[in-house]
Curated annotation (Swiss-Prot):
Pfam families: ASCH (PF04266). Its EC number is 3.5.1.135. Coiled coil: none annotated. CDD domains: ASCH_yqfb_like (cd06552). HAMAP family: ac4C_amidohydr. It comes from Escherichia fergusonii (strain ATCC 35469 / DSM 13698 / CCUG 18766 / IAM 14443 / JCM 21226 / LMG 7866 / NBRC 102419 / NCTC 12128 / CDC 0568-73). It catalyses: N(4)-acetylcytidine + H2O = cytidine + acetate + H(+); N(4)-acetyl-2'-deoxycytidine + H2O = 2'-deoxycytidine + acetate + H(+); N(4)-acetylcytosine + H2O = cytosine + acetate + H(+). It is an enzyme of class 3 (hydrolase). Belongs to the N(4)-acetylcytidine amidohydrolase family. This is N(4)-acetylcytidine amidohydrolase. Catalyzes the hydrolysis of N(4)-acetylcytidine (ac4C). Residues 6-101 form the ASCH domain. Keywords: Hydrolase.
Length: 103
């Protein structure tokens, strides 16, 4: 079995598969992904594979420069997005946006 290249919390799986979540915001440890990369996607909780994505763009963002567009791409409100990011990455302010599409 091939290893997964990136994982998402299980609660995001349905939104990813339905095309409602089209970005992920990560810290520096996952800043190496590049446009055109094809990635196997698994669930964080059990590493179970659930789809393959293609990275369509990458950029940097800070907690303060997150926008409504980012929130829409995450299928959340802006306050929800800021809270999720702060909960996952406490004390961090610099992040990496990975835009993707399911293949």
């Amino acid at each position: 079995m091939q290893p997964n290249d990136i994982t998402f919390f299980q609660r995001f799986q349905d939104d990813i598969l339905a095309g409602r979540k089209t970005i992920t915001i990560r810290d520096e440890s996952e800043s190496h992904f590049k446009t055109g990369d094809v990635l196997r996607v698994g669930r964080f909780e059990d590493d179970g594979y659930f789809c393959t994505i293609e990275v369509t763009a990458t950029s940097t963002v800070t907690l303060d420069t997150l926008t409504e567009k980012h929130a829409q791409q995450e299928n959340m409100t802006l306050p929800e997005l800021k809270k999720v990011i702060a909960d996952i990455y406490p004390g961090q302010t610099q992040f990496y946006v990975i835009e993707f599409k399911c293949l």
